[in-house]
């Protein structure tokens, strides 16, 4: 009887392990060529479909979403901030709770789920992440007056939060101003590329 219980336990453990590994393996890898929007959507049409759906729902252009998501996660579903270290060697946890394609923080993600009723939304799901970005960027229109086509300022509001953006907190961060400029430039490139690859 003990031997049968051990065998059953081993099978159960093996099954659970196999399911966990399968779940981890099922996340698609980031696209290989992030510089060309046409290559990106050919390799990962799910990204384009998710962003088109978010564009229909929230009016945020695909190229703005793509530029912001590139900057936040490089289209990696499991992207996380780096660890903090004490004395340079002792891991002290991650720099923030950001996770997934959109790098949404725990609190902001919870606010999104409450506001939209999308209680089962996951930050590692491209459809949910694109919808979150659309929702958040619409908050930036309402709270900060940032146009949905203004990728640079949308990114600043996304990074700093609307209250921080309204205070101009980004002005004390030259590195962030540089990144926001790059997001705006990338959005312009993606817009041109998307127009050419749809022909």
Residue ranges, per PLM feature:
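Short, Lys/Arg-enriched N-terminal segments with co-localized hydrophobic residues
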Residues: 1-8
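Sec-dependent signal peptide recognition
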Residues: 10-17
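Residue-level signal for mature regions of secreted extracellular proteins and peptides
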Residues: 17-18, 31
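C-terminal motif of bacterial Sec signal peptides marking the signal peptidase cleavage site
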Residues: 20-23
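Catalytic glycan-binding domains that act on GlcNAc-containing polysaccharides
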Residues: 27-199
């Amino acid at each position: 009887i003990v031997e049968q219980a051990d065998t059953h336990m081993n099978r159960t453990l093996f099954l659970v392990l196999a399911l966990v590994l399968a779940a981890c393996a099922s996340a698609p890898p980031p696209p290989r060529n992030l510089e060309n929007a046409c290559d990106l959507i050919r390799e990962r049409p799910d990204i384009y479909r998710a962003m088109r759906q978010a564009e229909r729902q929230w009016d945020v252009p695909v190229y703005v979403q793509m530029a912001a998501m590139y900057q936040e996660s490089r289209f990696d579903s499991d992207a996380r901030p780096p660890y903090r270290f004490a004395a340079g060697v002792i891991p002290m946890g991650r720099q923030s709770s950001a996770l997934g394609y959109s790098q949404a923080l725990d609190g902001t993600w919870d606010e999104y789920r409450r506001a939209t009723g999308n209680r089962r939304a996951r930050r590692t799901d491209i459809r949910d992440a694109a919808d979150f970005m659309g929702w958040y960027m619409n908050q930036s229109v309402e709270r900060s007056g940032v146009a949905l086509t203004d990728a640079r300022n949308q990114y600043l509001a996304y990074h700093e939060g609307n209250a921080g953006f309204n205070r101009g907190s980004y002005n004390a961060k030259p590195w962030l101003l540089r990144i926001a400029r790059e997001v705006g430039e990338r959005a312009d490139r993606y817009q041109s590329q998307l127009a050419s690859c749809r022909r």
